[in-house]
């Protein structure tokens, strides 16, 4: 295999989405598995839809995930030209004009109103699938020259007849399209900007991209792109089209669905572990040969085989992602967590983090738990008679103990022995009476973290 070069080429029209992150990750894994180069470039020609912060969000969140481009607008290789489409408009115009000069493309002088009329006529004639007819427009040579001089034209590629565009898709196998089903299409708009299907070919050729992994919505774009490669005598990259990501009900993820956070920045701000998301996303449409789940960055790269990319839609299971994050957070060292949360690195905080990191999937949850200790509740819970008996037994044992974690645990064990209670029937009454919280991590530590004075005060009210 020649030197592998893959690319992730988003538009800065929004922030890094789950789907975009998954695509970027698979492109990255493909390149790294074959010791190749992963390129980030920007398709920023849709000026009206561009978000000012879009490029920064994409690059910063990719970096946070551990998906580091070898080349980007911030780290370009001059050999391959510009990494933002807006900076290479002259290059696209040069290639478009070359196609015109070769008779493979032509200037189209239709106004938007005239195109609409052509659409309407086609519908009236019962033509369901509209194809542009370059002979439809009847204007004088004088009018044509006038529009030409004013730059009032687009450039259309002349689709060849009776050609089958076929490729061996990395994910799906053989796919083919008949050129007769595709009309002449615009490669350069009347404002001088290239269309996506044209610019992406020029970019991939200029950057010597060898493999393209992208969403399945691009399958129908591929024959148009192949037609440009053929016309210019350029070698096309290999294509692979990833399946969609759905919610748990099987519906394609929609950015309008507010029931699920869909941007990487949201999970970053909540304090999810970045490698947990890297790990989770890698399994969203791919499985390792040994069916491993929790894997290191390098293990995923080593095990990534494109032949194991799924042909079926992948369900985004937020609970599974939370499980992954939980595995990584509980194995983080306390100091790293304390620094990330900007907390004081003292003995109490270390014990708090060590206790509660076992049961959270996002670091922000630790701050919520810490509120219970920073601002202890004054409202005591209500207890059943059975619960009260357990609490009074604990109160009696506790009064004769030193205030240490081991002694608190010994008091709990003695209550279990004397009352015969165990599990929920033992722990929940004691937890409610001492911490005022129904659920939590290791009970003895949870009690100890409140301090002796608060615990004695709370126990004193139970008689």
UniProtKB/Swiss-Prot annotation:
GO terms for cellular component: cytosol. A motif ('HIGH' region) lies at residues 10-20. The keyword Nucleotide-binding applies. It is found in: Cytoplasm. Keywords: Aminoacyl-tRNA synthetase, ATP-binding, Cytoplasm, Ligase, Nucleotide-binding, Protein biosynthesis. The keyword Cytoplasm applies. Its EC number is 6.1.1.17. Pfam families: Anticodon_2, tRNA-synt_1c. GO terms for molecular function: ATP binding; glutamate-tRNA ligase activity; tRNA binding; zinc ion binding. It catalyses: tRNA(Glu) + L-glutamate + ATP = L-glutamyl-tRNA(Glu) + AMP + diphosphate. A motif ('KMSKS' region) lies at residues 252-256. ATP binds at residue 255. It is an enzyme of class 6 (ligase). One of its GO terms (biological process) is glutamyl-tRNA aminoacylation. Belongs to the class-I aminoacyl-tRNA synthetase family. Glutamate--tRNA ligase type 1 subfamily. Catalyzes the attachment of glutamate to tRNA(Glu) in a two-step reaction: glutamate is first activated by ATP to form Glu-AMP and then transferred to the acceptor end of tRNA(Glu). Monomer. This is Glutamate--tRNA ligase. It comes from Mycoplasmopsis agalactiae (strain NCTC 10123 / CIP 59.7 / PG2) (Mycoplasma agalactiae). The gene is gltX.
């Amino acid at each position: 295999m020649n030197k592998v070069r893959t690319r992730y080429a988003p538009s800065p029209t929004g922030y890094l989405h789950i789907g975009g992150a998954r695509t970027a990750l698979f492109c990255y894994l493909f390149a790294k598995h074959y010791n190749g180069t992963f390129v980030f470039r920007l398709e920023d020609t849709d000026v009206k839809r561009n978000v000012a912060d879009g490029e920064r969000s994409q690059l910063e969140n990719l970096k946070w995930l551990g998906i580091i481009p070898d080349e980007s607008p911030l780290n370009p290789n001059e050999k391959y030209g510009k990494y933002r489409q807006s900076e290479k408009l002259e290059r696209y115009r040069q290639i478009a004009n070359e196609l015109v000069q070769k008779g493979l493309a032509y200037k189209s002088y239709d106004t938007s109103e005239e195109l609409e009329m052509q659409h309407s006529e086609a519908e009236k004639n019962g033509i369901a699938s509209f194809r542009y007819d370059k002979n439809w427009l009847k204007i004088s040579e004088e009018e044509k020259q006038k529009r030409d001089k004013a730059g009032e034209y687009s450039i259309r590629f002349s689709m060849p007849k009776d050609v089958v565009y076929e490729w061996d898709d990395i994910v799906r196998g053989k796919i083919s399209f008949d050129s007769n089903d595709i009309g002449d299409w615009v490669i350069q708009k009347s404002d001088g900007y290239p269309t996506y299907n044209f610019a992406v070919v020029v970019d991939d050729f200029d950057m010597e991209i060898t493999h393209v992994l992208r969403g399945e919505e691009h399958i129908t774009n591929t024959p148009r792109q192949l037609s440009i490669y053929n016309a210019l005598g350029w070698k096309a990259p290999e294509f692979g089209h990833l399946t969609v990501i759905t919610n748990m009900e099987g519906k394609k993820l929609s950015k309008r669905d507010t029931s699920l956070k869909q941007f990487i920045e949201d999970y970053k701000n909540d304090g999810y572990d970045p490698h947990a998301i890297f790990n989770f996303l890698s399994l969203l449409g791919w499985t390792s040969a040994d069916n491993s789940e929790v894997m290191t960055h390098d293990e995923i790269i080593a095990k990534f085989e494109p032949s194991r990319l799924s042909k079926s839609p992948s369900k985004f299971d937020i609970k599974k992602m939370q499980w992954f994050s939980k595995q990584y957070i509980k194995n983080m060292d306390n100091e790293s967590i304390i620094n990330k949360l900007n907390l004081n690195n003292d003995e109490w905080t270390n014990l708090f983090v060590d206790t509660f990191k076992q049961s959270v999937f996002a670091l922000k949850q630790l701050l919520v738990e810490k509120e219970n200790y920073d601002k202890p509740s004054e409202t005591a819970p209500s207890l059943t008679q059975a619960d009260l008996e357990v609490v009074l037994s604990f109160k009696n044992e506790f009064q004769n103990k030193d205030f240490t974690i081991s002694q608190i645990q010994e008091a709990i064990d003695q209550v279990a022995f004397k009352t015969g209670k165990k599990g929920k029937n033992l722990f929940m009454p004691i937890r409610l009476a001492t911490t005022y919280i129904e659920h939590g991590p290791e009970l003895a530590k949870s009690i100890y973290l409140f301090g002796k004075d608060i615990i004695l005060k709370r126990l004193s009210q139970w008689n």
